[in-house]
Amino acid sequence: MRIWWLLLVMGACTRSVFSQDTCRQGHSGIPGNPGHNGLPGRDGRDGAKGDKGDAGEPGHPGGPGKDGIRGEKGEPGADGRVEAKGIKGDPGSRGSPGKHGPKGSIGPTGEQGLPGETGPQGQKGDKGEVGPTGPEGLMGSTGPLGPKGLPGPMGPIGKPGPRGEAGPMGPQGEPGVRGMRGWKGDRGEKGKVGEAPLVPKSAFTVGLTVISKFPPPDAPIKFDKILYNELNHYNVATGKFTCHVAGVYYFTYHITVFSRNVQVSLVKNGVKVLHTKDSYMSSEDQASGGIVQELKLGDEVWMQVTGGERFNGLFADEDDDTTFTGFLLFSSS
């Protein structure tokens, strides 16, 4: 503030010198009293950011923080150095009793102490080792006679004595018990092969051909296609089967129907024993029949169309057959 007052005084003197043309410069006046404080000036604009200040002094250590979360187990560290032995610590609290150590060596016999109080009876100890055999004792006196013992085991058989004289013949004994069955004897030699039995035979199978199809009615059908007739029991010329072996026979027929209706019968000695009828529709058809009959020697069996030519539609060609079969089941002789 003093600097401001000094500048004001010097300014006033300068103005008075320039205003007086003839005035001389006098001696400096006495400095005036300080003026009153002026009004505070307005805030200046923010200056540019200053340089970074020097680092402050380290603060005082803070208080201990809260315990953090337990971290994962770290890897084992390297073996530390063996430091010098530290100062002996205070005695720790008494630990739990340890296991029994090995038996120590027997110490010297101490002085006999005062008799202690009788303790509780201890547990039974382990069986001790057998001690050495003691010296033989003196022979005792003979004891009293004991009771009679049990009979001993039978001794060995003695040598046979001399043969005695023959005694008188005794009475005849009863018959003995029947003995056990003997062992099975060896198998005998194989016998000679016997003669084969004569089995009676009789069989045939015959059929129609293109020539013999549509046979005439009311007469034995002459089957001229021989499939089997080794014994010639079926006569192709007559169309009849003649019995040469008395017995039971089976007869069967299979017919193809074409262009006309069919009505056939199986005849035995002139008697019709089986009938088959089939009506022709528009294509080939099949029909069949079978029967078992007992025959005597000389009996005759055949097939024939019944009902006229309207019912003789028995057909045969390269692809279709009409057959008649008979054979012996078993003989009655």
UniProtKB/Swiss-Prot annotation:
UniProt-annotated stretches for the region Disordered: 22-194
Compartment annotation: Secreted
Protein's gene: C1qtnf9
Note: Overexpression of CTRP9 in obese (ob/ob) mice significantly lowered serum glucose levels.
GO BP terms: energy homeostasis; fatty acid oxidation; negative regulation of cell size; positive regulation of cellular response to insulin stimulus
Keywords: Collagen, Glycoprotein, Hormone, Hydroxylation, Repeat, Secreted, Signal
Function text: Probable adipokine. Activates AMPK, AKT, and p44/42 MAPK signaling pathways.
Domain C1q as annotated: residue spans: 197-333
Taxonomic classification: Eukaryota, Metazoa, Chordata, Craniata, Vertebrata
Distribution of this protein across tissues and organs: Expressed predominantly in adipose tissue. Females express higher levels than males.
Collagen-like domain boundaries: 24-82, 84-130, 134-193
Glycan-carrying positions: K73, K127
Bias kind Basic and acidic residues: ranges: 42-57, 67-88, 183-193
Assembly behavior: Multimers (predominantly trimers). Interacts with ADIPOQ via the C1q domain to form a heterotrimeric complex.
Modified positions (4-hydroxyproline) in chain numbering: P31, P34, P40, P58, P61, P64, P76, P115, P151, P160, P175
Record-level GO cellular component terms: collagen trimer; extracellular space
Protein name: Complement C1q and tumor necrosis factor-related protein 9
GO molecular function terms listed in the Swiss-Prot or TrEMBL record: hormone activity; identical protein binding
Main subcellular location: secreted
Modified residues (5-hydroxylysine): K73, K127
Segment forming the signal sequence: 1-19
Native source organism of the sequence: Mus musculus
Domain of life, source organism: Eukaryota
One Pfam family cited in the UniProt record for this chain: C1q
